[in-house]
């Protein structure tokens, strides 16, 4: 092994674990069984540790980038991979604090979720077969709740307001929130998908059907992401030419992971990066499920989307694990739990959540005796309660705050939910 490659490999091993800069450079690098000089490896790990502790992760990142550049200039072929480890982008100690009342917001969220379900069920009782989506909003409720409570800003005399593209299938939840706020009557909620008599609610967001309620149409699926990109670009156009002050306005686009397979959903993402649309924020509800089955049963949709968007020049924020996982991550000094998370595909994660704590203990933690020992003091219920990041308002708030503050790139939040 030549000196340049040896230096690069040993630095990257530590950076992958602690900085989360890269996920895999190649199987060769990640296969520790090929390490023919463990002492040298340990020396480089300790050296990088020292840089991180003394000068911070930014300096360490710079050194790694210089090493990669030097290796490539020397003729080394280093495959590029745009994915990072299957963990939250923002570590716990860097989370921006949630400023609200978690208990009060949880109660409000529960009422909205209940009313969203009842709107669909009561409509189908009155008119069997009329349809309506229940699961989409239930999985995304926290994502919307944190946005409404802390980030979405309405228009006023001095500010044009933020623009929000709501995922079409989540409309029952948006109606339910409006009802709770007193902006919609019970009669209207009871007439979900029944517009012909003049006092009903449209199936999906559409300003022609409900001009005083919806800003943008987002169905058929995939149109919201595409239009959101061009809306954000238009706001930049207005500001750059002095037509209107849109400098602080944000465009939020909510969509599902299955929806991202629509050709329109990712059709203009390179334009958003090229135009540096830092006024644009995508929020993808990654519940791993579409109408007809898993989105990527034998893969990882979050990793795939991260690769697509990061490779196109976006700022990617992954919100995968909730706060109940934090103590386990703190114990994971050897990276074994992260390794297990990398091994599992989305179909397995769905299985773990569906079959409960005992099954998860045996099949997820049980693969490695060391992992199983770490959860020995936890009940099956405790293991079942280990939450996904998209249901944790603290994790979601931190990601949104980072996205709003980010400059020079559009941002995408990939939130894992049930």
Question: Which ranges hold each PLM region?
Answer:
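Amphipathic alpha-helical packing elements
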Residues: 37-77
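Cofactor-/ligand-binding subdomain signature composed of acidic, glycine-rich
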Residues: 40-43, 47, 63, 78-126
